[in-house]
Structure formats: structure tokens, C-alpha cells
């Protein structure tokens, strides 16, 4: 069996790859693994279970709840809430485990299972590996040890989760949003109720789009992967800014008053300055990834802020933040982590903090985001090559040195192996788009000839 867990839980086409049987089995396995790790020692264990609104979440939720309860875990079922809400509630309610059913920005037929440990943190790799091992052992015939009588778990609908999470969001804001008009695109997803309520309670005038989930329309032409509707709505309504989430609202992208996109790097730049001014940017450092735009790095250097870059993935950003004690990190895609207030990317919190900075300064989002200038970026995927030689080919190394010499300080080259396919990704940033395209094209040709 190949590894079930990816960088963000277990995902697949619901009822094909991710079946009710798999969801139930993984939940029982997770309960057994956490029990043997001592997480449940000395008390009756509790889990928080939430989901996004896609149709398959209903039967998968039933399977997860059944699995946990059959393993002796009491379940607080919080219903449709964002991933960061489930993480927050897992921590604030003192639960031993959290489970979120979502495939984030993926299309409706997909779904996923993500586990959180006590405190609302993602499970460590070794625990995920152990869950897979235990699941496979029992799938192939070894019986479970099952509680009976009063030992089985009880299931409760925890209806206070919505208000508790919104109150948390409002409570950590540095200032109110009175006077701001904000358009919210909720991707017909998990934040369709939460985000508009939070922005309204914070004082903003709110216009919503993509906030009518029917189980089938999640991420369908809307949300953070499709900004066209948000751009048009912001201009149409004369709003100060627009905020877009994905299906589980763990990410946030923005649009300024003119309908121009403000990406994750720009959001990080705005928040880094806000947190520095408030004395909250620990070690004057922000964490990004190797894909963070060079313009972001240059802007932070001008402001005396250090950028630490990790491998691609919010998991690696979070690991760096926790290990080094940094307060802010994220990705260009809009995963932003404010570690003092969240254990994972939180799109609603990010949007609120961005709007709060606009309200506090009286400056437009375009002006604030202008602290950094995005350098044109070109990405070319070169398939069917020996990706393992990307760092050892002398021919390729020579071509990279020549490209870097041509680009100078206002450009950069990044070659990355795909983690799942036999391809190499060539990324080039330059002062203008034509130069970036030319350099990327030449490097892609060398990759093809040297590694093909």
C-alpha cells in the first residue's frame, strides 16, 4: 500500500479513493495510536469533528464519528466550519484529537481527512505513519480491541463552536473595521457563515458572494482559485477591498479597490510591517518558502526584516516557525500563519488582520501592498527527465550560473524536482517578463537535453 497521508492529510475522490470504510478505519486507527502514545492517559478521550459543505462530507463525517466512538472516544460534532476553526476548537476545548473533512481548494468530487493533535496542531509524520501501519494491520485481518458498555464513545452536537470561534477572531484583532466596505468570496465553502459574521461584528460593511453552499458548488468558479468574480464585485460595489477564501478557508487572497490581486507574499509584507510596528514580529523575521517572490525578499530587506525560506508547503513553514519561535509565516498561495493566534493557516483571521491594517492606517490596500513590487515570474515544467540529477549535472549547473549572472541582483533561478512526477520545475524571476521568459526557456531546454 502506498502512503495514504500526503502533506495535508488523506485526500482522494470521495466514495472511490476515500471511502466510508477507509474513513472509519483511519479514525479507529488514529484513536488506537494516540491511546498507545499516552494521549488519552488518565481521562476519557474527546474529539472535535468538523467538515466543509461538500456533499460527501455528510457520509464521511458519519464514518469518522462512528469510528471514533466505537474506539471509546467521545465526539463533539461541530458541523460545517473552517479547518482553522476545528484546529482552534480542538485546542480551546482541550480535546485530544481533531478531525476535519475537506479537500480544501480541490473540486467537489474530492474530499479529505485531516487529523489534529491535542492543542490543534497537525499530527507529526511519525504518528501519521503509525496510523497507516495500524490501519493496514487491521484491514488485513487483525481484530480491533473494542470497548463495550459504558466504554463506547458518546456523540454530541456542539452548536457553540461557531460563536466561540468568531469571538476568538474578534478578540485578537488590534482594531475595529468601522468605515470599511469589504466584499467576501467564500467559495461556497466552510466559511460561508463564519467570515461574513466576523467581519460584520468587527464593524465592516459586508458584501458577500460565493456564500450559498449547496454541497455541489464548492470552489466552482469562485474563491481564492478564481478571483474574477471578486475583482468585478469589488469594483461594482465601490468596496475598499475584497477577500477570497478556498473551500476550507485555510487560505486568503485579496483584491484592492481597483480590482487588482494582492497575493500571499504581499499580504505577508503588509502584516509583517503591522506586526513589527506593534512589537509582535519576533526576531524581526518572517517565514516564506523557496517560491516566495524575490520582490518580497527585497522589500523585507529594505525594512530590516529577515526572510527565512523553507521548502514549499505550509507544513514546512509552520515547522520552521515553531522550531525558531517566529510569529508570522506563509506562502504565495495565501496560506498565512499567525502563530500567536492560530496553529494553522487561517483565511478569515488573515483577511481580518489585513482589513484592520487598512482601517488603522487610513491607507488603501494598494498603497500598503505597494511596499513590495512583484518581480515577473515564469514557471516551466519539464516532463520525462531524470529529476534525481537536477543537482548533479555539470551542464545544468553551468547554465544556471550563466543565467544568474545575466539576471543579476534583480532576478533569480530555482530548479525543483516534482515530488510525485518525473519532471523538473524551472522558475525564473527577472526585472521584466520577456527576460524571465527567455531565460526560463533556455534553462528548460538545457534540463531537457541534460536530464532527458
Curated annotation (Swiss-Prot):
Record InterPro entries: A-D-PHexomutase_a/b/a-I, A-D-PHexomutase_a/b/a-I/II/III, A-D-PHexomutase_a/b/a-II, A-D-PHexomutase_a/b/a-III, A-D-PHexomutase_C, A-D-PHexomutase_C_sf, Alpha-D-phosphohexomutase_SF, GlmM_bact
GO CC terms, sorted: cytosol
Keyword Zinc: no
Residue sites binding Mg(2+) per the record: 104, 246, 248, 250
Reaction catalyzed: alpha-D-glucosamine 1-phosphate = D-glucosamine 6-phosphate
Name the record gives this protein: Phosphoglucosamine mutase
E.C. number(s) listed in UniProt: 5.4.2.10
Domain of life: Bacteria
The gene coding this protein: glmM
An annotated Gene Ontology molecular function: magnesium ion binding
Cofactor: Mg(2+)
Function (record text): Catalyzes the conversion of glucosamine-6-phosphate to glucosamine-1-phosphate.
KW Magnesium (keyword) present: yes
Organism: Streptomyces griseus subsp. griseus (strain JCM 4626 / CBS 651.72 / NBRC 13350 / KCC S-0626 / ISP 5235)
Family (UniProt): Belongs to the phosphohexose mutase family.
Enzymatic class: isomerase
Cofactor remark: Binds 1 Mg(2+) ion per subunit.
Residues with the Phosphoserine modification: 104
One GO BP annotation of this record: peptidoglycan biosynthetic process
Modifications after synthesis and translation: Activated by phosphorylation.
Lineage, opening ranks: Bacteria, Bacillati, Actinomycetota, Actinomycetes, Kitasatosporales
Active-site residue list: 104 (phosphoserine intermediate)
Keywords, comma-separated and alphabetical: Isomerase, Magnesium, Metal-binding, Phosphoprotein
Amino acid at each position: 500500500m502506498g502512503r495514504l497521508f500526503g502533506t495535508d492529510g488523506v485526500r482522494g475522490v470521495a466514495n472511490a479513493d476515500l471511502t466510508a470504510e477507509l474513513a472509519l478505519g483511519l479514525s479507529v486507527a488514529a484513536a488506537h495510536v494516540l491511546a498507545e502514545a499516552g494521549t488519552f492517559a488518565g481521562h476519557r478521550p474527546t474529539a472535535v469533528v468538523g467538515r466543509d459543505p461538500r456533499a460527501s462530507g455528510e457520509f464521511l463525517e458519519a464514518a469518522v464519528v462512528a469510528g471514533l466512538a466505537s474506539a471509546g472516544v467521545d465526539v463533539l460534532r461541530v458541523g460545517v466550519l473552517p479547518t482553522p476553526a476545528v484546529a482552534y476548537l480542538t485546542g480551546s476545548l482541550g480535546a485530544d484529537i481533531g478531525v476535519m473533512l475537506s479537500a480544501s481548494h480541490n473540486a467537489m468530487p474530492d474530499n479529505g481527512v485531516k487529523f489534529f493533535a491535542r492543542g490543534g496542531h497537525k499530527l507529526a509524520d511519525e504518528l501519521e505513519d503509525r496510523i497507516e501501519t495500524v490501519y493496514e494491520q487491521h484491514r488485513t485481518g487483525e481484530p480491533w480491541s473494542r470497548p463495550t458498555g459504558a466504554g463506547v464513545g458518546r456523540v454530541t452536537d456542539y452548536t457553540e463552536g461557531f460563536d466561540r470561534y468568531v469571538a476568538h477572531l474578534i478578540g485578537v484583532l488590534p482594531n475595529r473595521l468601522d468605515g470599511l466596505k469589504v466584499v467576501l468570496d467564500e467559495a461556497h465553502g466552510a466559511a460561508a457563515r463564519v467570515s461574513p459574521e466576523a467581519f460584520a461584528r468587527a464593524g465592516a460593511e459586508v458584501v458577500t458572494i460565493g456564500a450559498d453552499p449547496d454541497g455541489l458548488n464548492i470552489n466552482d468558479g469562485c474563491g481564492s482559485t478564481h478571483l474574477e468574480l471578486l475583482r468585478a464585485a469589488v469594483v461594482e460595489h465601490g468596496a475598499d477591498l475584497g477577500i477570497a477564501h478556498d473551500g476550507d478557508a485555510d487560505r486568503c487572497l485579496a483584491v484592492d479597490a481597483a480590482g487588482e490581486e494582492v497575493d500571499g507574499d504581499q499580504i505577508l509584507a503588509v502584516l509583517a510591517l503591522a506586526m513589527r510596528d506593534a512589537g509582535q514580529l519576533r526576531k524581526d523575521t518572517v517565514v516564506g518558502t523557496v517560491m516566495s517572490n524575490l520582490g518580497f525578499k527585497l522589500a523585507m530587506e529594505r525594512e530590516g526584516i529577515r526572510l527565512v525560506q523553507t521548502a514549499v508547503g505550509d507544513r514546512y513553514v509552520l515547522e520552521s516557525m515553531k522550531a525558531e519561535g517566529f510569529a508570522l509565516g506563509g506562502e504565495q498561495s495565501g496560506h498565512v500563519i499567525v502563530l500567536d493566534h492560530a496553529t494553522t493557516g487561517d483565511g478569515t483571521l488573515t483577511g481580518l488582520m489585513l482589513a484592520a491594517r487598512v482601517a488603522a492606517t487610513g491607507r488603501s490596500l494598494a498603497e500598503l501592498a505597494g511596499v513590495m513590487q512583484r518581480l515577473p515570474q515564469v514557471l516551466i515544467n519539464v516532463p520525462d527527465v531524470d529529476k534525481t540529477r537536477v543537482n548533479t549535472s555539470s551542464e545544468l549547473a553551468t547554465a544556471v550560473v550563466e543565467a544568474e549572472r545575466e539576471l543579476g541582483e534583480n532576478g533569480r533561478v530555482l530548479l525543483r524536482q516534482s515530488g510525485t512526477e518525473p519532471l523538473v520545475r524551472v522558475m525564473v524571476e527577472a526585472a521584466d517578463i520577456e527576460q524571465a521568459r527567455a531565460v526560463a526557456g533556455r534553462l528548460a531546454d538545457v534540463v531537457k537535453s541534460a536530464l532527458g
